[in-house]
């Protein structure tokens, strides 16, 4: 999901995508959801960010993840206990930050759907041995 530089507001395109993802999340109630926010490597504009209490890209990435969590809860009724938000700052790029297109790709949120620990342990027990 793309964001404007320095922003954690969810854009219209991302809202459409979240609608589809929410349906999947609601269908698989036995799974937890990890939401990771990411940024490009552009330093935060200190003056504008200070008004929003954003100190750096770590803060911004966490706010991006948190905005998705709140959107899923408020618009689709996803249970908060199933959601975890985290920020990765600028340290998990998927593209080069040397171009504007690359920076846009790095301003994103990743959504990872995982089985709960007991389900994961069941999968391990069922795995074939070598």
Language model features: what each stretch is:
Residues 4-16, 20, 24, 28-31, ...:
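Periplasmic OmpA-like peptidoglycan-binding domain that tethers envelope proteins to the cell wall
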């Amino acid at each position: 999901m793309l964001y404007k530089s320095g922003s954690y507001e969810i854009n219209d395109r991302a809202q459409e995508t979240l609608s589809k993802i929410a349906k999947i999340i609601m269908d698989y109630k036995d799974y937890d959801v990890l939401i990771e926010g990411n940024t490009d490597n552009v330093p935060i504009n200190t003056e504008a960010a200070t008004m929003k209490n954003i100190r750096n890209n770590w803060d911004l990435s966490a706010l991006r993840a948190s905005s998705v969590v709140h959107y899923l809860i408020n618009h689709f009724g996803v249970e908060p206990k199933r959601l975890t938000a985290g920020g990765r700052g600028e340290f998990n790029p998927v593209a080069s930050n040397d171009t504007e297109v690359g920076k846009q790709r790095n301003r994103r949120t990743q959504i990872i759907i995982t089985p709960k620990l007991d389900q994961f342990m069941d999968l391990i027990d069922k795995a074939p041995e070598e």
